[in-house]
C-alpha cells in the first residue's frame, strides 16, 4: 500500500529535512513516528528537501507499508508520536504511480520578511528580520525578470548537485502586509538555496542599493559571486506542491499564519 501525507513543520532546531547521522532532522522524526504506528520500518520520500531552519506548511511525502490503518488512525497515531513542531495535516491512500517528488509539477515557497526597526520576539524563528525602508513594489517589479525557463546559475548554491541550472519560474509576487513583506514564488522545481538567493538580491533592490534591472543582469552573468548574500532561512516556507488532478490530493490553506492564499 502506498500512502501520501501532507505535513507541516517548524524547521528551527532541525538540521533540515534529510535524515543525517548524529543530528536531528524532520525526516528522521517522521519516519520514527510512522514506524511506531505501522509496527514496521518506514522510509519516506518527500516533494522537496528543505534546509536547516526552513519551514513547511505544504510538504508532501509518500511511503510504502503493509500495515492496514484508516486515515484517522494514521493521522492521530503519527501526530501523537511526533514532536510538537511537526504535524500531519492530511493522509490519503494513492496508487503506485504516485511519487511525492517525481509526480510533482510545481513547488511554491513564501519568504516572510519582518520589516521593522526592532527585532521580533514571538515570531523570531518564523520570519526574517530586516530593518531599513524596503520598497516591496520595487522588488515585485524587478522580480518579473525571473519568469519563464532560464539559467539560474547566479542563484544556485556552490554545493548544488543539480545536473542543470535551468528552472521554469511560473509566477513571483512581492507584496506588503503591514510590517511584513512576502515574496511568493512558484516554479517547476528549485535549485539549492535558489529562493533564498533570489530574496537576498531582491532585498538589495528593495532597499535601493541596486537598479530595477539587476535581476536580469544577474541572470545574464551566470555567476553566483555577482549576486547578493543568501537570505536567512527563518522566513522561508514550502507552502504548496502541485500534482496532476488524477491523484485528487487535499488542498488546504497555504499559510503561514494569517496569510491569504
Swiss-Prot record:
NCBIfam families associated with the record: hisT_truA
Gene that specifies this protein: truA
Name by which UniProt lists this protein: tRNA pseudouridine synthase A
EC number: 5.4.99.12
Single GO BP term: tRNA pseudouridine synthesis
Lineage top rank: taxon: Bacteria
Entry-linked InterPro entries: PsdUridine_synth_cat_dom_sf, PsdUridine_synth_TruA, PsdUridine_synth_TruA_a/b_dom, PsdUridine_synth_TruA_C, TruA/RsuA/RluB/E/F_N
Annotated residues for binding of substrate: 109
Active site annotation, chain numbering: 51
Family under the similarity heading: Belongs to the tRNA pseudouridine synthase TruA family.
Entry function: Formation of pseudouridine at positions 38, 39 and 40 in the anticodon stem and loop of transfer RNAs.
Keyword tags: Isomerase, tRNA processing
Reactions it catalyzes: uridine(38/39/40) in tRNA = pseudouridine(38/39/40) in tRNA
Organism the protein comes from: Shewanella baltica (strain OS155 / ATCC BAA-1091)
Top-level enzyme category: isomerase
SUPFAM superfamilies xref list: Pseudouridine synthase (SSF55120)
Pfam family, one: PseudoU_synth_1
Subunit (UniProt): Homodimer.
Coiled coil start-end: none
UniProt GO MF annotations: RNA binding; tRNA pseudouridine(38-40) synthase activity
Amino acid at each position: 500500500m502506498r500512502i501520501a501525507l501532507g505535513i507541516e513543520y517548524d524547521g528551527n532546531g532541525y538540521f533540515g529535512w534529510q535524515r543525517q547521522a548524529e543530528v536531528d532532522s524532520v525526516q528522521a522524526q517522521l519516519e520514527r513516528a510512522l514506524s511506531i504506528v505501522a509496527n514496521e520500518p518506514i522510509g519516506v520520500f518527500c516533494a522537496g528537501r528543505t534546509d536547516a531552519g526552513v519551514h513547511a506548511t505544504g510538504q508532501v511525502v509518500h511511503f510504502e507499508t503493509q500495515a492496514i490503518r484508516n486515515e484517522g488512525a494514521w493521522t492521530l497515531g503519527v501526530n501523537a508520536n511526533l514532536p510538537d513542531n511537526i504535524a500531519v495535516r492530511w493522509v490519503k491512500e494513492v496508487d503506485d504511480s504516485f511519487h511525492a517528488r517525481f509526480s510533482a509539477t510545481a513547488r511554491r515557497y513564501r519568504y516572510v520578511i519582518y520589516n521593522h526597526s526592532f527585532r521580533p520576539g514571538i515570531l523570531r524563528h518564523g520570519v526574517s528580520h530586516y530593518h531599513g525602508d524596503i520598497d516591496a513594489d520595487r522588488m515585485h517589479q524587478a522580480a518579473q525578470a525571473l519568469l519563464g525557463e532560464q539559467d539560474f546559475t547566479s542563484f544556485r548554491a556552490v554545493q548544488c548537485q543539480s545536473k542543470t541550472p535551468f528552472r521554469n519560474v511560473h509566477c513571483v509576487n512581492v507584496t506588503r502586509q503591514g510590517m511584513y513583506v512576502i515574496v511568493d514564488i512558484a516554479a517547476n522545481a528549485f535549485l539549492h538555496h535558489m529562493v533564498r538567493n533570489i530574496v537576498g538580491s531582491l532585498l538589495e533592490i528593495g532597499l535601493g542599493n541596486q537598479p530595477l534591472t539587476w535581476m536580469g543582469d544577474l541572470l545574464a552573468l551566470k555567476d553566483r559571486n555577482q549576486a547578493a548574500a543568501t537570505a536567512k532561512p527563518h522566513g522561508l516556507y514550502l507552502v504548496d506542491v502541485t500534482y496532476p488532478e488524477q491523484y485528487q490530493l487535499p488542498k488546504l490553506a497555504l499559510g503561514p499564519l494569517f496569510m491569504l492564499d
